[in-house]
Amino acid sequence: MMKQFLPQGVCLRCQGCCRFKEQNSAWLPCLMDEEIQELLDRKIPPALISMERKIQPYSNPAGEGFICAFFDIKDNKCKIYDWRPFECQLYPFLINLRDRKIILTVDLNCPYVKDNLQSKEFKEYADYLISFLNSPVQIKLLKDNPQLLKAYEDISEAVELKIFDETK
Protein backbone atom coordinates (compact mmCIF):
# COMPACT_ATOMS: atom_id res chain seq x y z
CA MET A 1 0.00 0.00 0.00
CA MET A 2 1.29 3.45 -0.83
CA LYS A 3 1.83 6.20 1.70
CA GLN A 4 -1.00 8.72 1.89
CA PHE A 5 -0.78 12.48 1.46
CA LEU A 6 -4.05 13.44 3.13
CA PRO A 7 -4.65 12.52 6.75
CA GLN A 8 -7.76 10.29 6.83
CA GLY A 9 -9.59 12.55 9.27
CA VAL A 10 -9.05 15.60 7.07
CA CYS A 11 -10.19 13.72 3.98
CA LEU A 12 -13.37 12.44 5.60
CA ARG A 13 -14.46 15.94 6.70
CA CYS A 14 -14.40 17.34 3.14
CA GLN A 15 -17.50 15.67 1.70
CA GLY A 16 -16.17 16.08 -1.83
CA CYS A 17 -14.91 12.62 -2.65
CA CYS A 18 -16.87 9.47 -3.36
CA ARG A 19 -19.67 11.49 -4.94
CA PHE A 20 -20.31 11.71 -8.66
CA LYS A 21 -22.41 13.90 -10.94
CA GLU A 22 -23.20 11.07 -13.36
CA GLN A 23 -23.73 7.37 -12.83
CA ASN A 24 -21.08 6.62 -15.45
CA SER A 25 -18.60 9.28 -14.32
CA ALA A 26 -14.94 9.10 -15.39
CA TRP A 27 -14.20 9.73 -11.71
CA LEU A 28 -15.56 6.33 -10.63
CA PRO A 29 -12.64 4.19 -9.50
CA CYS A 30 -11.60 1.47 -11.93
CA LEU A 31 -10.74 -1.86 -10.40
CA MET A 32 -7.89 -4.23 -11.08
CA ASP A 33 -8.63 -7.96 -11.32
CA GLU A 34 -7.05 -8.61 -7.91
CA GLU A 35 -9.15 -5.83 -6.35
CA ILE A 36 -12.31 -7.31 -7.83
CA GLN A 37 -11.31 -10.72 -6.47
CA GLU A 38 -10.63 -9.26 -3.02
CA LEU A 39 -14.05 -7.60 -2.99
CA LEU A 40 -15.69 -10.88 -3.98
CA ASP A 41 -13.64 -12.81 -1.40
CA ARG A 42 -14.88 -10.37 1.24
CA LYS A 43 -18.46 -11.21 0.21
CA ILE A 44 -19.13 -7.91 -1.54
CA PRO A 45 -22.12 -8.43 -3.87
CA PRO A 46 -20.99 -8.67 -7.51
CA ALA A 47 -23.75 -6.20 -8.44
CA LEU A 48 -21.63 -3.45 -6.84
CA ILE A 49 -19.04 -3.91 -9.59
CA SER A 50 -19.97 -2.71 -13.06
CA MET A 51 -19.19 -4.54 -16.30
CA GLU A 52 -16.65 -1.75 -16.98
CA ARG A 53 -14.74 -2.87 -13.85
CA LYS A 54 -15.80 0.16 -11.85
CA ILE A 55 -17.52 0.52 -8.52
CA GLN A 56 -21.24 0.78 -9.19
CA PRO A 57 -22.59 3.96 -7.54
CA TYR A 58 -26.12 4.47 -6.24
CA SER A 59 -28.40 7.51 -6.34
CA ASN A 60 -27.64 10.02 -3.62
CA PRO A 61 -30.58 9.80 -1.20
CA ALA A 62 -29.75 13.26 0.17
CA GLY A 63 -29.70 15.11 -3.13
CA GLU A 64 -28.36 15.12 -6.65
CA GLY A 65 -25.84 12.78 -8.18
CA PHE A 66 -24.50 9.42 -7.11
CA ILE A 67 -22.54 7.95 -4.19
CA CYS A 68 -19.87 5.24 -4.18
CA ALA A 69 -21.37 1.91 -3.14
CA PHE A 70 -18.80 1.66 -0.35
CA PHE A 71 -19.33 5.11 1.10
CA ASP A 72 -21.37 5.37 4.30
CA ILE A 73 -23.13 8.69 3.86
CA LYS A 74 -24.32 8.80 7.52
CA ASP A 75 -20.81 8.51 8.97
CA ASN A 76 -19.04 10.10 5.98
CA LYS A 77 -16.64 7.13 5.90
CA CYS A 78 -15.45 4.53 3.45
CA LYS A 79 -16.63 1.04 4.44
CA ILE A 80 -13.59 -0.53 2.78
CA TYR A 81 -10.99 2.14 3.64
CA ASP A 82 -8.30 -0.32 4.77
CA TRP A 83 -8.49 -2.25 1.48
CA ARG A 84 -9.84 0.40 -0.87
CA PRO A 85 -8.87 0.31 -4.55
CA PHE A 86 -5.60 1.69 -5.91
CA GLU A 87 -7.29 4.72 -7.48
CA CYS A 88 -8.92 5.61 -4.16
CA GLN A 89 -5.57 5.31 -2.41
CA LEU A 90 -4.01 7.57 -5.02
CA TYR A 91 -6.60 10.37 -4.87
CA PRO A 92 -6.30 13.44 -4.98
CA PHE A 93 -3.56 12.44 -7.37
CA LEU A 94 -4.70 11.04 -10.70
CA ILE A 95 -3.01 9.04 -13.42
CA ASN A 96 -3.96 10.87 -16.57
CA LEU A 97 -3.38 9.63 -20.12
CA ARG A 98 -2.63 12.41 -22.60
CA ASP A 99 -0.98 12.15 -25.99
CA ARG A 100 0.15 8.57 -25.28
CA LYS A 101 1.97 9.77 -22.16
CA ILE A 102 1.12 8.97 -18.59
CA ILE A 103 0.90 12.14 -16.54
CA LEU A 104 0.59 12.32 -12.79
CA THR A 105 -1.83 15.14 -11.99
CA VAL A 106 -3.43 16.38 -8.83
CA ASP A 107 -7.02 17.51 -8.42
CA LEU A 108 -7.12 21.08 -7.14
CA ASN A 109 -10.76 20.65 -6.16
CA CYS A 110 -9.36 18.97 -3.05
CA PRO A 111 -9.24 21.70 -0.37
CA TYR A 112 -6.26 20.08 1.38
CA VAL A 113 -4.26 20.15 -1.85
CA LYS A 114 -5.18 23.79 -2.46
CA ASP A 115 -4.03 24.69 1.04
CA ASN A 116 -0.79 22.68 0.84
CA LEU A 117 0.19 22.93 -2.83
CA GLN A 118 3.25 25.08 -2.12
CA SER A 119 4.29 23.22 1.03
CA LYS A 120 7.41 21.16 1.57
CA GLU A 121 5.12 18.26 2.53
CA PHE A 122 3.40 18.39 -0.87
CA LYS A 123 6.71 18.49 -2.76
CA GLU A 124 8.11 15.59 -0.75
CA TYR A 125 4.97 13.51 -1.27
CA ALA A 126 4.89 14.28 -5.00
CA ASP A 127 8.53 13.16 -5.25
CA TYR A 128 7.71 9.99 -3.30
CA LEU A 129 4.70 9.26 -5.49
CA ILE A 130 6.63 9.81 -8.72
CA SER A 131 9.34 7.45 -7.51
CA PHE A 132 6.75 4.91 -6.32
CA LEU A 133 4.85 4.96 -9.63
CA ASN A 134 8.06 4.67 -11.64
CA SER A 135 9.13 1.51 -9.80
CA PRO A 136 9.19 -1.63 -11.96
CA VAL A 137 6.34 -3.19 -9.94
CA GLN A 138 4.06 -0.18 -10.42
CA ILE A 139 4.95 0.23 -14.11
CA LYS A 140 3.98 -3.42 -14.62
CA LEU A 141 0.77 -2.82 -12.67
CA LEU A 142 -0.13 0.10 -14.95
CA LYS A 143 0.72 -1.87 -18.09
CA ASP A 144 -1.36 -4.83 -16.88
CA ASN A 145 -4.29 -2.57 -15.96
CA PRO A 146 -4.80 -0.09 -18.80
CA GLN A 147 -8.25 0.75 -17.38
CA LEU A 148 -6.39 2.77 -14.72
CA LEU A 149 -5.04 5.10 -17.40
CA LYS A 150 -7.84 7.57 -17.98
CA ALA A 151 -8.07 10.69 -20.07
CA TYR A 152 -9.33 13.15 -17.50
CA GLU A 153 -9.85 15.77 -20.17
CA ASP A 154 -12.43 17.70 -18.20
CA ILE A 155 -9.99 18.44 -15.41
CA SER A 156 -9.11 22.08 -15.71
CA GLU A 157 -7.76 22.44 -12.22
CA ALA A 158 -4.91 19.98 -12.18
CA VAL A 159 -1.21 20.51 -11.77
CA GLU A 160 0.99 18.29 -13.89
CA LEU A 161 3.73 17.07 -11.61
CA LYS A 162 5.78 14.84 -13.85
CA ILE A 163 5.44 12.98 -17.09
CA PHE A 164 6.82 9.48 -17.16
CA ASP A 165 7.12 7.46 -20.31
CA GLU A 166 4.55 4.64 -20.51
CA THR A 167 7.05 2.51 -22.44
CA LYS A 168 9.35 1.99 -19.43
Residue ranges and their predicted role:
Residues M1-K168:
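Short loop/turn segments that flank or connect secondary-structure elements
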